[in-house]
Curated annotation (Swiss-Prot):
GO BP of this protein: phosphatidylinositol biosynthetic process
Single GO cellular component term: endoplasmic reticulum
Similarity annotation: Belongs to the VAC14 family.
Main function: Scaffold protein component of the PI(3,5)P2 regulatory complex which regulates both the synthesis and turnover of phosphatidylinositol 3,5-bisphosphate (PtdIns(3,5)P2). Pentamerizes into a star-shaped structure and nucleates the assembly of the complex. The pentamer binds a single copy each of PIKFYVE and FIG4 and coordinates both PIKfyve kinase activity and FIG4 phosphatase activity, being required to maintain normal levels of phosphatidylinositol 3-phosphate (PtdIns(3)P) and phosphatidylinositol 5-phosphate (PtdIns(5)P).
InterPro entries, A to Z: ARM-like, ARM-type_fold, Vac14, VAC14_Fig4p-bd
Species of the source: Danio rerio (Zebrafish)
One Pfam family, short name: Vac14_Fab1_bd
HEAT repeats: 5-42, 89-126, 171-208, 212-249, 442-479, 550-588
Record protein name field: Protein VAC14 homolog
Annotated spans, Disordered: 334-374
Annotated localization: Endosome membrane; Microsome membrane
Domain comment (free text): The C-terminal domain (residues 523-782) mediates pentameric interactions and is necessary for the formation and maintenance of the PI(3,5)P2 regulatory complex.
Keywords: Endoplasmic reticulum, Endosome, Membrane, Microsome, Repeat
């Protein structure tokens, strides 16, 4: 430095001492400067004061020489001390050169700068608040300084500044938040610790309402929560916990909608840094749970995003039990928000609603979403779904039904989706069909194929929920439509006669079924045809559950009608055998069995005829149907025709099963009728016919023993009065043409024989036959 240069009002001795390498000499110079400035203050000579500060700043603090810079720093601090309460008038000139030295490469100089600024701030106190942002910016850099002395000095200055902010009521939070939002994305641990400590302080000041600006810093807080430092994570958890307490205490002023997407993002765990992200996910899921409960329908526009985050968590194991429980609570609370009012047209709902003005979207929301999108990449969230509200008009909160259905459908299609998640998806679909049937039926054609495919799921519970959804689709009045087109029924096999309204009016108690009922039955049978393992393993289970969920009579009537036109005769026979077993053995079919047992009404006779025509695909099932309906003479006539059929091992096994059924509680009434030989001769003849069909087997012995218990076998002859009795019984069933039914049986069995012979001719392994 040129010592001959004029630095007045600084004396040459002061200038020389300020440039000295010894701290003690620079300190003496500082005391001289302090005395000089005090004189100027006493004289109210502000021009000279500014001149001194300018010289110290430009010629010393910003000098190229390190010792000069040190002298300038201590000199500026001395000026501040001399100015006292008047230092506020010169703070910019005092602070700026000191902050510049924060970037110096010399750690000792950075320490002196920190010391100088401490003295300046200590004197000015609240007057420094207008310059808070530049002070905070400088301190945030020193917080990550590698030198421990500098870091220690910055901590002292930091504590002083926090005390000033805490005791003041003039802190400009609006001006500070943009800087805070920028700095909160720092990856440096010390910088993060510094940021968190400041948020904690500001949050604790009663006059500072940081909650209003939480949407702008919440994303950054969740990213800090994923820090590798346990201490930083603990501090961040504490801050987030305090914010959540404040939210729960005063929910009316919280901008829930602006923070919903932030939580959606952080509720979804990326693969990177999985252990820390688990904490982020649990915390954000806890927040989401509280938000849904506190904000209610305000979060509905974000429901698709919430479900994207929540649904996968429902399949977590006990290692993430807390997250799973929080997700379950979110899911349950969100589901409760959907009401029948959501089924109204948007125009209707808007005219009815008069929401509070505080639900209007913030102007900053778009900018916030942009910053969120940018920040995702830095923390491994680049592949995570981000959702925008269903409607930008928050004045009328509407359900994002299209988005929800899209999310649910995607989870059903994903083979990796866990069982509990699949169950939750199906519960959602069922709930939506109950609450918003009119809107949901617009999505039914796209959902229907996947719902049918879900019947092949490994879990019984999933299948049960799936059947509930399908049953609701099939029975909902909202599904009434004139269109007969179906999802996934382009195959010629499924171009069947869809029963009209008369088919649904089988009995006064039969509920009306919509067009999807028949589409469902057609597609269900088609699926059984394509997946024989499904029919074998789950067919009876599925049909029995449907009989509980829907009207059993409708199910059997429609399936019989469809099977009547089935071209795959082998499948038709197998399906009839399955349906017949269900009809005869399932507790769910008790009422239907009673309806068929007597055939006293026109409706029951019509049902019998419908079932009979399809049951003809399986001769033994047809006989068992006749036994159930007490058509013993017709059963006997059918058994007489068995001699013309191709008797296979499978056929005899079915006869064996029928004998076992006759011994079961289902046919108790039939066995008791054996006591009345006089009025049931054809029952006995039919049973003897079965006996003659059987080889010498256990079933043969069983039936033979039963028939040996029949009293007075000589009375089995058909007498004239018995013919009258039988005739009288048939007169009670005027709607059944038994001769025509017998002819139909012959035609169906002829087709089966023809197909069997064709198959035998093409195959080297024909059906097993008895020679």
């Amino acid at each position: 430095m040129n010592t001959e240069k004029d630095f007045s009002p600084l004396t040459p001795n002061i200038v020389r001492a300020l440039n000295d390498k010894l701290y003690e000499k620079r300190k003496v110079a500082a005391l001289e400067i302090e005395k000089l400035v005090r004189e100027f203050v006493a004289q109210n000579n502000s021009a000279q004061i500014r001149h001194v500060i300018q010289i110290l700043a430009t010629e010393f603090a910003l000098s190229q020489h390190p010792h000069s810079r040190k002298g300038g720093l201590i000199g500026l601090a001395a000026c501040s001390i001399a100015l006292g309460k008047d230092s506020g008038l010169y703070l910019k000139e005092l602070i700026d050169p000191v902050l510049t030295c924060f970037n110096d490469s010399d750690s000792r100089l950075r320490y002196y700068a920190c010391e100088a600024l401490y003295n300046i701030v200590k004197v000015a106190r609240g007057a420094v608040l207008p310059h808070f942002n530049v002070l905070f910016d400088g301190l945030s850099k020193l917080a990550a300084d590698p030198d421990p002395n500098v870091k220690s000095g910055s901590e002292l200055l930091d504590r002083l500044l926090k005390d000033i902010v805490t005791e003041s009521n003039k802190f400009d939070l609006v001006a500070f938040v943009p800087l805070l939002r920028e700095r909160i994305y720092s990856n440096n641990q010390y910088a993060r610790q510094f940021i968190i400590s400041w948020i904690h302080v500001l949050e604790s000041v009663p006059d500072i309402n940081l909650l209003d600006y939480l949407p702008e810093i919440l994303d950054g807080l969740f990213q800090i929560l994923g820090d590798s430092s346990k201490e930083i994570r603990r501090m961040c958890e504490l801050v987030l916990g305090e914010f959540l307490k404040e939210i729960k205490k005063n929910p009316s002023s919280v901008k829930f909608a602006e923070m919903a997407n932030i939580l959606v993002i952080h509720c979804q765990v990326s693969d990177e840094s999985k252990s820390t992200n688990d904490l982020i996910q649990l915390t954000s899921m806890t927040w989401m749970r509280e938000f849904i409960q506190l904000a209610g329908r305000v979060v509905l526009p974000y429901s698709s995003g919430i479900l994207t985050a929540v649904l996968p968590c429902l399949s977590y194991d006990d290692r993430k039990k807390s997250t799973k429980e929080a997700a379950s609570a979110c899911n349950h609370s969100l589901m409760k928000l959907v009401t029948p009012e959501d089924d109204e047209d948007d125009e209707e709902s808007q005219t009815k609603s008069s929401p509070p003005s505080d639900e209007a979207p913030s102007k900053k929301e778009g900018d916030l979403n942009d910053s969120l999108n940018e920040s995702q990449e830095s923390v491994g969230f680049s592949n995570i779904s981000f959702f925008t509200p269903a409607s930008s008009d928050r004045s009328a909160v509407t359900l994002d039904l299209d988005g929800i259905v899209q999310v649910l459908d995607r989870h059903l299609h994903d083979s990796s989706t866990g069982m509990m998640t699949r169950i939750a998806v199906l519960k959602w679909l069922y709930h939506l069909y109950i609450k918003t049937p009119r809107k949901m039926f617009k999505h039914t054609d796209s959902l229907f194929p996947m719902l049918l495919k879900t019947l092949s799921d490994e879990s019984d519970e999933v299948i049960l929920k799936d059947l509930e959804v399908l049953a609701e689709i099939a029975s909902s009045p909202a599904g009434q439509t004139d269109t007969s087109g179906s999802c996934d029924i382009s195959d010629s096999k499924t171009e069947l006669h869809i029963p009209g309204s008369k088919m649904t009016d089988l009995s006064p108690s039969t509920p009306s079924m919509n067009s999807y009922f028949y589409k469902f039955m057609i597609n269900l049978l088609k699926r059984f045809s394509l997946e024989r393992k499904l029919l074998e393993m789950r067919g009876a289970f599925i049909i029995r559950q449907l009989c509980l969920l829907l009207h059993a009579e409708n199910i059997f009537h429609s399936m019989a009608d469809i099977l009547l036109k089935e071209e795959d005769l082998k499948f038709a026979s197998t399906m009839v055998q399955t349906l017949n077993t269900i009809l005869l053995t399932s507790a769910e079919l008790f009422q239907l069995r009673n309806q068929l047992k007597d055939l006293r009404t026109q409706e029951s006779c019509a049902l019998f005829c419908c079932l009979y025509r399809s049951w003809c695909h399986n001769p033994v099932a047809t006989v068992s149907l006749c036994f159930l309906t007490q058509n013993y003479r017709h059963a006997y006539d059918l058994i007489q025709k068995f001699g013309d059929l191709e008797v296979t091992v499978d056929f005899l096994m079915e006869v064996d099963k029928l004998v076992q059924l006759i011994e079961s509680p289902i046919f108790t009434y039939l066995r008791l009728q054996l006591l009345d030989v006089e009025h049931n001769p054809y029952l006995i003849k039919a049973l003897y016919g079965l006996l003659m069909l059987l080889p010498q087997s256990q079933a043969f012995q069983l039936l033979s023993h039963r028939l040996s218990c029949v009293p007075n076998p000589e009375l089995m002859r058909t007498l004239e009065d018995q013919k009258v009795a039988v005739k009288d019984k048939h007169l009670a069933q005027p709607h059944i043409d038994y001769s025509e039914l017998l002819q139909h049986f012959d035609r169906v069995q002829s087709k089966h024989l023809e197909v069997r012979h064709q198959r035998t001719g093409r195959s080297e392994h024909p059906d097993r036959k008895l020679m």
